[in-house]
């Protein structure tokens, strides 16, 4: 199929360097490009989510609770429209290689263990969770910096300066703060998402649909999968944000969860849930749609 695409004059495959790439590296490139698009578009939602959760962490959170729309307006008013993209640099440093690493790891695992058949639902969960674990651990220092940038509580001048400051004041442990909560959030999200996404796609008669509408249908399947996965992993996201915004050097995930419950009840675990669900759902749906379309252009099965 790859040769046929080259002969057909597909621009994506016209260069010899691209056609000679290892399939795993092609998956990395496709994933990185899809991550770039989705991160840039939906960064404002991530910033608002972090601000909502940071407000809950402060002592004044027991009083008035800002709503998502009010926070959007406040950020634009105080920091101008570009303030909504505060923290986009560490987001890029985390998501571009992170999404590429996720998709290339997923591609490797799928083609190693499931080259002859499609994975079953539970196997899809394990594939997604395992791939995300690799990416999340590698990118966690940038996740910590991104969270602190977006909160507006830290005066870091650059990503490098932030990494240096955290390492100097908190040690290597500070760069990996919230690791447990991050894995509790990201691994299940990716596993649940992949399971529902592949199941939803199987319900759609792909052979009876015009290929022109295939990306739209895949995006719709991604929306459904993203909503379900976001709701299931929202508590872990709140815990992760509380840990990474805290000045304390030692954190225990269980203690943070207990504090949230004691101070805010069960609803505290779903603070910032709407902007996160919107962002994660739209980002995942777009990333998968772009990734699969690019892989198809390269003649590879995603």
UniProtKB/Swiss-Prot annotation:
Subcellular location(s) per record:
Mitochondrion inner membrane
Q: What is its main location?
A: mitochondrion
HAMAP family in the cross-refs: SLC25A38 (MF_03064)
Give the Gene Ontology MF terms in alphabetical order. glycine transmembrane transporter activity
Q: What does the record say about its membrane topology?
A: Multi-pass membrane protein
Question: What catalytic activity does the UniProt entry give for this protein?
Answer: glycine(in) = glycine(out)
Q: Give the record's keywords alphabetically.
A: Membrane, Mitochondrion, Mitochondrion inner membrane, Repeat, Transmembrane, Transmembrane helix, Transport
Source organism superkingdom: Eukaryota
Question: One Pfam family for this entry, by name?
Answer: Mito_carr
User: What parts of the sequence cross the membrane?
Assistant: 28-53, 87-113, 125-150, 178-201, 217-243, 272-290
GO biological process, alphabetically ordered:
erythrocyte differentiation; glycine import into mitochondrion
Q: Which family does it belong to?
A: Belongs to the mitochondrial carrier (TC 2.A.29) family. SLC25A38 subfamily.
Asked if the Swiss-Prot or TrEMBL record annotates the protein with the keyword Acyltransferase, the reply is no
Q: What does this protein do?
A: Mitochondrial glycine transporter that imports glycine into the mitochondrial matrix. Plays an important role in providing glycine for the first enzymatic step in heme biosynthesis, the condensation of glycine with succinyl-CoA to produce 5-aminolevulinate (ALA) in the mitochondrial matrix. Required during erythropoiesis.
Give the originating organism. Answer: Xenopus tropicalis
Cite the repeat ranges for Solcar: 22-112, 119-203, 213-297
Q: What is this protein called?
A: Mitochondrial glycine transporter
Q: Which InterPro entries match?
A: Hem25/SLC25A38, Mitochondrial_sb/sol_carrier, Mt_carrier_dom_sf
Q: What GO CC annotations are associated with the protein? A: mitochondrial inner membrane
Q: Which gene encodes it?
A: slc25a38
């Amino acid at each position: 199929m790859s040769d046929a695409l080259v002969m057909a004059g597909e621009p994506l495959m016209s260069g010899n360097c691209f056609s000679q790439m290892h399939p795993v590296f092609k998956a990395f490139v496709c994933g990185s490009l899809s991550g770039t698009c989705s991160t840039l578009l939906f960064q404002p939602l991530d910033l608002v989510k972090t601000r909502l959760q940071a407000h809950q962490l402060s002592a004044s959170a027991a009083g008035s609770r800002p709503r998502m729309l009010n926070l959007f307006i406040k950020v634009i008013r105080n920091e101008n429209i570009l303030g909504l993209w505060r923290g986009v640099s560490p987001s890029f440093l985390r998501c571009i290689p992170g999404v590429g690493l996720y998709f290339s790891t997923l591609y490797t695992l799928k083609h190693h263990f499931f080259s002859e058949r499609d994975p079953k639902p539970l196997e899809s969960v394990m594939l997604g969770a395992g791939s995300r674990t690799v990416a999340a651990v590698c990118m966690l220092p940038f996740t910590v910096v991104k969270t602190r940038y977006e909160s507006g509580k830290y005066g870091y001048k650059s990503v490098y300066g932030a990494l240096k400051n955290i390492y100097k004041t908190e040690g290597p442990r500070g760069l990996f703060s919230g690791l447990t909560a991050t894995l509790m959030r990201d691994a299940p999200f990716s596993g649940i998402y992949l399971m529902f996404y592949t199941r939803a796609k199987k319900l759609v008669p792909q052979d009876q649909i015009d290929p022109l509408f295939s990306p739209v249908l895949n995006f719709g399947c991604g929306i459904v999968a993203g909503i379900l996965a976001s709701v299931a992993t929202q508590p872990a996201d709140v815990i992760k944000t509380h840990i990474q915004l805290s000045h304390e050097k030692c954190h225990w995930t269980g203690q943070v969860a207990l504090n949230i419950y004691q101070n805010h009840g069960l609803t505290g675990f779903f603070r910032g849930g709407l902007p996160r669900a919107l962002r994660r759902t739209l980002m995942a749906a777009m990333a998968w749609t772009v990734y699969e379309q690019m892989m198809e252009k390269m003649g590879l099965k995603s």
